[in-house]
Amino acid sequence: MVQKYFYRIIFYSLATLLLSNCKVPYNPNLKSSETNALIVEGFIDGAAPVSFKLSRSRKLTAGDTAKAVSELNAKVSIEDDHQNVFPLIELGNGIYKSNNTLTLNATYQYRLHIISSNGEEYLSDLVPFKSSPPIDSIGWEFKNGGVQTLLNTHDPNNSTLYYRWSFSETWQFRTPFESYYVYDAGNNTVIPRTEQVFNCWQTDSSTNIYLASTTNLSSDVINQMPLAFMGQHDPKLSVLYSILVTQYALDVTGYNYWLAMQNNTQNVGSIFDPQPNETSGNIHCLTNPSELVVGYVNAGNSSSKRIFISNSSMPQDWNLPSDCLSIIIPDNPDSLKFYFGSVYDPILLITLTSGATVYSAALAPCVDCTLKGTNIKPSFWP
């Protein structure tokens, strides 16, 4: 019995060794147009300034660390089926935006028009203007040790049927130490800070695709739609957290496009999950019809709602103890240059009983919150 078990170990060990040495790099044979495809992200919005982001796809071999290639110096405009044109302004990094909220007619159809810097012309299909109903409420609950945000909405006219959501999260956070001094490298001295770096804010946008359809329900009601989730001890909830949710009404073609994108990007994990498939949007290259363009343009009035969640609503053990430690640094030129000229930041000036002065200090991320966010308070913050 032992011998049989021994031979079984030998067999599986050899099999594992052979399989591990049979890895061959896979280099897909993609067309150049598929490795440099135009990616269009945005929505023709009648309730907020219109914003589109244009970029180019990357080669698979570029890896996750490669930066997205922004599409710069393009001419971008919104057009309707009554010959009205609304030019967008380039803000940089591939962002094109209207100065203000556009006055759009709900009975018209709309499309996006792009002329790239090299003269390629792109046009989306005309789409109907479809307005979103208001968001009824956004709530949250404790779930799986974390916090799950939830959305409720409904359309009394039973005409929306297809929904998509995006959101922006903003959270306030603080460093373990509040610093009142900063190192002046030019003069090798420590001076009082002129701005606080203890209290900061950070903002991030949703990257997943959030969809729902009520076509199989008796009424056009969305109940407890899960959106952002924060795991246990998430620092987003260390002080105050806010989520701004934007809701879009889609037509059935647009919904099917986003559903396919969701299946291709979020639901592929095993042989039992939906497998990747080709997803066609509604944007086309007029000058080169064979060129691949990624994206789908919808139009309508979005609706949005913001809520705040305070750390005071979290369990007492939500905020984990900091692993930041402070040290004492003598107040002399050599020590200041050695410590503060590298990785430490001063915190306080301390006068010892002997009359000598020293500085308490800590690693920069433990002192300066602007390394991770901004110390400018958002206009919507309470």
Stretches found by the model and what they are:
Residues 2-10:
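Bacterial N-terminal signal peptides that target proteins for export
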Residues 18-21:
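C-terminal motif of bacterial Sec signal peptides marking the signal peptidase cleavage site
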